[in-house]
Amino acid sequence: MAKPRVYELAKVLNVDSKTVLEKLKDMGEFVKSASSTIEPPVARRLKAEFAKDNAKGDSKPASSAQKPAAKPVQQRRPAAPSAPASTSSSAPTPAAPARQASPASAHQQAPTPGAPTPRPQGGARPGMPTPGRHGQHDNRENGRDNREGRENGRQSRPNDRRNNDRRNNQGRPNNGQPGQHQNNRDNASAPRPHAQGGAGANGGNAASNAIPRPHAQGPRPGNNPFSRKQGMHTPTPGDIPRPHPMARPTADSGRGGRPGRPGQGQGQGRGFRGGRPGQGGQGGPRPGQWGHNRPGQGGGSQGAGQGGARGGFRGGQGGGNNFQGGGAPSNGPARGGGRGGRGGAAGAFGRQGGKSSKARKNRLAKRHEYEELKAPTIGGVRIPNGNGQTIRLRQGASLADLAEKINVNQAALVTVLFHLGQMATATQSLDEETFQILGGEIGWNIQLVSAEEEDKELLQQFDINLDEEELQDDEDLKPRPPVVTVMGHVDHGKTRLLDTIRKTNVIAREAGGITQRIGAYQVTVNLEGEPRKITFLDTPGHEAFTAMRARGAELTDVAILVVAADDGVMPQTVEAINHAQAAKVPIVVAVNKIDVPGANPEKVRGQLTEFGLVPEEYGGDTMFVDISAKQNLHVDKLLEAVLLTADAELDLRANPDMDARGATVEARLDKGRGAVATVLVQQGTLHVGDAIVAGTSYGRVRAMLDENGQPMEAAGPSTPVQVLGLTSVPTAGDLFLVASDDRAARQIAEKRQATERAAQLAKRRKVVSLEDFKKKFAESEIDMLNIVIKGDSSGSVEALEDSLMKIEVSDEVGIQVIHRGVGAITQNDVNLATVDKAVIIGFNVRPNRQVADLAEREGVEIKYYSVIYRAIEDIEASLKGMLKPEYEEVVTSHSEIREIFRSSKFGNIAGVMVQDGEVKRGTKCRILRNGVATVNDLEISSLRRFKDDVQSVKEGYEAGINLGTFNDIELGDIIETFEMQEVERK
């Protein structure tokens, strides 16, 4: 079926293409645009994901619909008053207790059961709204509801308590009798001071019939004329308060005091704005204004002295002629009071009163955050202390990665590191030592994840378990051939032994007669009439191929140590023993060249005993076999010993039915086939068409070849095979595995590349400390020989680079490999060498004609080698030639002064006899007087023989010497001439 495109799927799913692209990204699929195609399995997964999301979305409303709704507050109509308003002397009707408002409806103002409905005062015209009674009550009721909705989320004001207070403040005294509050609970809990005079009470009763009393409503939203509408309703003519014509402030009237401080007021009220109770606070709208129906800034009072509903704005302790907080005003003299409290609406000239609760909350939150910061200040920055917590970072991590983990600023970490004596940028990769120093200072235990753990975590993201082979059942395991590595010193006959076993002649094709790459072969031998397969790995014996020998020891099951009977144990023999013992691999010793004159196999046995290889005839457990690979003597006994050792000490079984896994033995770049990797399958079976990942290389297996170049369809465990189809040349020793598809293989390879690049940067970018700053400047003056290495195989390039980096000539010169690669020398290599003034080394590779012409035009030197030790010798000689020359002083002549001639034009002229050597004009000289050098830095400015100017005078001749302006010479002085000659450095 055809592959669907993204926009087509978006149409089918009834979503836009952007949503589909984001969903694909979340699923781990990388799609470029909406017109890109995707695989049918991915499309099915995508549809399933959308179906799952839709199912989740449908279940949410259903679940929410099942929740019971909050029980509404029961609305009750207010009961009719028990007596008409005219009967003021009748007993008051007790008010029913207010119902507790539920949290769901805390903002609703339910009328109190049993409370009387507000009625117009006598004298008001029927049908006309009385100011401060019905119209003001209704409009302000709406404004208060709006305000309560806005202030519902403020944490600093308790909603439930405030709403209850507002409801209770609406209570009016029944039958016109002041002092009877409608909320019994509030009256019982709030302290009420005694009335300080009866005049106030009587005056309050008289005034209650003439002047309408304002209701205790919510605070005014604000009166800033420069701001937009602040929640206030549009006033109607009946709502506009009219000042009393006789309202004038008296001298004794005072303003309300600060809430929370007892004053001189008559009653006990509570400020409305801010929700904080105030002691006293009976101030009216303005001091001494009678008849003003606008609630003042004083708190509510309880009638005249003790009664009255609480209401009004938050205010203070005023008393006297002011409004009594919504109660009856008193006609008596003002009782004084303090200054008005904080709060109030924002005015035209800025906000008055204290800061808002939001600002207080932010200040408290900042204070809390400040107290949480317990780390010491380092360099002016404050970083939270980790208290020894452990944090894991990847290899090559930077300060930016650490800052993201512990949630601090990157610049702060840079500052701390600078004060610790280290200089690094926020994005620079750091090593483990620097992270440990920084972590110890800020209280964090920083650990860098090893490369193996990081790779294991990466593979687990793609459902690949590297420990799967340890969890195999015994029924799934089947026998596999042993992997045998042939190791030993160079020219001891390793490749000759393999040629004899395979009946081939590989050694004739090796440059210089030495092996410079790992060869993998599989042969079939007969053991007791039964055919058995053995996989052989031939490792180089030259000292430059240490990494190859170590790699071969890690991949092998049994090691054959080849030792020449005439040479005995050599340095690379000891190294091979150490590699095998480190890998815990059993060793079978093959004493070769027993047919050569001077061969002494017993000497070899005695030498190897010192390294823990004791022969069986000496009471040990190591098998020794005397062979001659050239004459094919006892080779069959050697193979028999290998198989017996493998059967006795090893469990050679593997599961051939799982996905293939193994190691890359060798890799090269073929001109016609591309990247060719020789791999050894260790688990499972590798098939043509599998998607594989080898290190940072990936691809699909296009073809597989055996060691003879014959195509193969499948390769089982312990089978060496050449794989074609990789996008790049992998590194020798990289593990390979089979991925689920090409996309997963590419993602694994790309993430490995990023990890490897970061690790290399961490090693290359050494953090410069302040103490080493001068040292780094001195190192910048070192002459570096830049080299570009190109070779035919990955292992050869690696071995050549390691060998060149080990060359130590002097501290004044060094080697820097700016690029290395596998394959022919390309134009990019020449361009890179041109910029960096580098030398290109071609190991078994050549450039084409165009690249060679370009290198000649640019003056780039290309050196070709086929044997590794010749390349090492030439580079070492080049480094010695780069050394700065050293000079030493060489005495050339001695001349005795026998006469002094004085000249007004030239000064003193010494007549000398040359005793030895040759005197030359312009050479340096010194004066020796009685065997002591009086003056050193002199120069022979003129040299004459009689009247002729000469260049030199030899031994036994007389001459006249003028020393320029120096005239302090005496008879008998010796003029010694010398030269500075360059000395060859070693």
From Swiss-Prot:
Pfam families to which the protein is assigned, alphabetical:
EF-G_D2 (PF22042), GTP_EFTU (PF00009), IF-2 (PF11987), IF2_N (PF04760)
Chief location of this protein?
cytoplasm
Please list where the region (G3) is annotated. 538-541
Asked if Disulfide bond is a keyword of the record, the answer is no
| Residue spans of biased composition, Basic and acidic residues class | 49-59, 135-168
Feature: compositional bias, Low complexity: 60-112, 170-182
Q: Which GO molecular function, any one, fits this protein according to its record?
A: GTP binding
| One GO CC term, this protein | cytosol
Q: Does the keyword Protein biosynthesis apply?
A: yes
> Which family, according to UniProt?
Belongs to the TRAFAC class translation factor GTPase superfamily. Classic translation factor GTPase family. IF-2 subfamily.
Q: Which PANTHER family would you find in this protein's record?
A: TR-TYPE G DOMAIN-CONTAINING PROTEIN, TRANSLATION INITIATION FACTOR IF-2-RELATED
What does the function comment of this entry state?
One of the essential components for the initiation of protein synthesis. Protects formylmethionyl-tRNA from spontaneous hydrolysis and promotes its binding to the 30S ribosomal subunits. Also involved in the hydrolysis of GTP during the formation of the 70S ribosomal complex.
Can you name this protein? Translation initiation factor IF-2
Q: Which organism is it from?
A: Bifidobacterium longum subsp. infantis (strain ATCC 15697 / DSM 20088 / JCM 1222 / NCTC 11817 / S12)
